[in-house]
Amino acid sequence: MFLGTHTPRLDDKGRLILPAKFRDELAGGVVITKGQERCLYVFPAPEFQRIADQLRAQPMTHKAARAYSRVFFASAHDEVPDKQGRVTIPGHLRDYAALDRDLVVIGAHTRVEIWDRVAWESYLAESEDDFADIEEGVLPGL
């Protein structure tokens, strides 16, 4: 399970050093793709395969599933982290998430998310006030 907030920097070659606590789970390979709210999702390869299997199970006639699959898979980039725990974020994904040098990498249960630092701070400012209200709808009875 991926937890926590980390603040690495993107190097001049578009590489990110993965947080040390995430490296073992991601060492076998990752898939980086577009996420919602203009962040990037980083999945361990087996988790990405699980999601791919779920999408494959949707009927081809399901318009929303087709649209989601197109964006999700067309933007995906698979890679094995190097010995230093680095992965290269392709230019089209850096552009999508408006990534600058200063990043925020968060653990989000079964995936890792990569955010531009300013975008993450803005997202938190908008979302934290509603956090208590959202909990009851997402986790009733907690």
UniProtKB/Swiss-Prot annotation:
UniProt key word Transcription regulation: yes
Among the entry's GO cellular component annotations, what is one? Answer: cytoplasm
Q: Which domain of life is it from?
A: Bacteria
Q: Which CDD domains match?
A: MraZ_C (cd16321), MraZ_N (cd16320)
Give the matching Pfam families: MraZ
UniProt-listed SUPFAM superfamilies: AbrB/MazE/MraZ-like
Q: Mention one GO biological process in which this protein takes part, according to its record.
A: negative regulation of DNA-templated transcription initiation
Q: Which InterPro entries match?
A: MraZ, MraZ_C, MraZ_dom, MraZ_N, MraZ_sf, SpoVT-AbrB_dom, SpoVT-AbrB_sf
Residue pairs linked by disulfide bridges in the UniProt entry: none
Sorted keywords for this record are: Cytoplasm, DNA-binding, Repeat, Transcription, Transcription regulation
Q: Name one GO molecular function term.
A: transcription cis-regulatory region binding
**Primary subcellular site in the record, as a coarse category:** cytoplasm
Where would I find the SpoVT-AbrB domain in this sequence? 5-47, 76-119
What the record says about family reads: Belongs to the MraZ family.
Oligomeric state and interaction partners are given as: Forms oligomers.
What is the protein name stated in its UniProt record? Transcriptional regulator MraZ
Source organism (scientific name):
Salinispora arenicola (strain CNS-205)
